[in-house]
């Protein structure tokens, strides 16, 4: 974070000084990071007192000060120097009530509202000094694209990007406050669970470059329809000023339509060839035919409208055909910021999975390949994961009977896709059937409930008999089964929504065998 006095922070957030005099607040400076975990606080830091599942941050204020924090941003006095922003029903909290699960009295919402004010002020000052902000949204692929963009932009300057998927009302402003005066590029993921979320995040740190990847069915339960999801994703292009740039994946018709919703310049990316110059959605950055290697890493030729750039071969270091659109968007960001096509190609080739549990492919010493894609799941990403599994297991083809293929036994260990609302039963049924159509050898459905039953039943109805498809109670039961029956050379995909907890299973399964160099 930029260097600010405690007095200035208090002024920005509209708080009151408690257990610290105005004179001392004018002298004390926040020179470290802003943290919501007291164990992460260091000298010069600012601690956010937020309610949690196991404890309330207000109860850890003293330990944060002892660790070097200069003050605590809190909703009530905490017995140590604090900036207090008590909940005020007359002014509201900017729609932040309910964001934190364990926030019965609204104290967490008050602190989040203050955090947003602080991040907004810091972002404005840094943008005035030359910072470029990139915002990324989409129903799937945000984190993978963020990681790719970060690696490309690191060629050009200092980059700040969120770890993992810090993309909500807490993670977004927290990431903004990681930026300093030496930061050149700030990359932000923007997620949404209700209309207005993306607009609110964009108002905190207005992006100069906005990227929209796709409109899918993630969080369909909250929005009610794909059209409502599209309207919310459109909030990002609408937030970009005329001097900015919007990058759209026009292979998704809902995203292509967003070009009409922005006053900014539009850069279109597509997997299709550039065959219709002048048509509304003719791309500015596009690929030739895409091929996959034996581990489903895409290779393609990158084309741009710049006649000086020519066509450039790119071999991605990440896994899955679905990564092509993410890489195209990352390339478009890099080119817009001044990277050459050759620099983009080198960066994308050198980048494997960065964030944990997202298409991490590991081959153990015994030849078992584990595809860990357990961070989250929705119908689109689940289909992509199954297609990658089939490709790797069938030796670089989706058809194990194709001449030259070297089929390996495949396992799909799948859990629930959360937040799909009324479509949950149908979507889980489709995934079960798809696993059979892709000739997955063994399908292990983890958990219980109507959606999981639909996935299991869908596979059975599609023709999976006997022990080819099983339903186990929990991740522990799945691990027991895998340890007993996985053989050297098998390929195992593990995927579900984060709440299912399959990430720990993937970690153990990978650790069961030394990794092949």
From Swiss-Prot:
Its EC number is 6.3.2.10. GO terms for molecular function: ATP binding; UDP-N-acetylmuramoyl-tripeptide-D-alanyl-D-alanine ligase activity; UDP-N-acetylmuramoylalanyl-D-glutamyl-2,6-diaminopimelate-D-alanyl-D-alanine ligase activity. It catalyses: D-alanyl-D-alanine + UDP-N-acetyl-alpha-D-muramoyl-L-alanyl-gamma-D-glutamyl-meso-2,6-diaminopimelate + ATP = UDP-N-acetyl-alpha-D-muramoyl-L-alanyl-gamma-D-glutamyl-meso-2,6-diaminopimeloyl-D-alanyl-D-alanine + ADP + phosphate + H(+). Its main location: cytoplasm. Keywords: ATP-binding, Cell cycle, Cell division, Cell shape, Cell wall biogenesis/degradation, Cytoplasm, Ligase, Nucleotide-binding, Peptidoglycan synthesis. GO terms for biological process: cell division; cell wall organization; peptidoglycan biosynthetic process; regulation of cell shape. It comes from the Bacteria. SUPFAM superfamilies: MurD-like peptide ligases, catalytic domain, MurD-like peptide ligases, peptide-binding domain, MurE/MurF N-terminal domain. It is found in: Cytoplasm. InterPro entries: Mur-like_cat_sf, Mur_ligase_C, Mur_ligase_C_dom_sf, Mur_ligase_cen, Mur_ligase_N, MurCDEF_CellWall_CoF430Synth, MurE/MurF_N, UDP-N-AcMur_synth. Pathway: Cell wall biogenesis; peptidoglycan biosynthesis. ATP binds at residues 138-144. It holds the Pfam family Mur_ligase. GO terms for cellular component: cytoplasm. Belongs to the MurCDEF family. MurF subfamily. Involved in cell wall formation. Catalyzes the final step in the synthesis of UDP-N-acetylmuramoyl-pentapeptide, the precursor of murein. This is UDP-N-acetylmuramoyl-tripeptide--D-alanyl-D-alanine ligase. It comes from Mycobacterium leprae (strain TN).
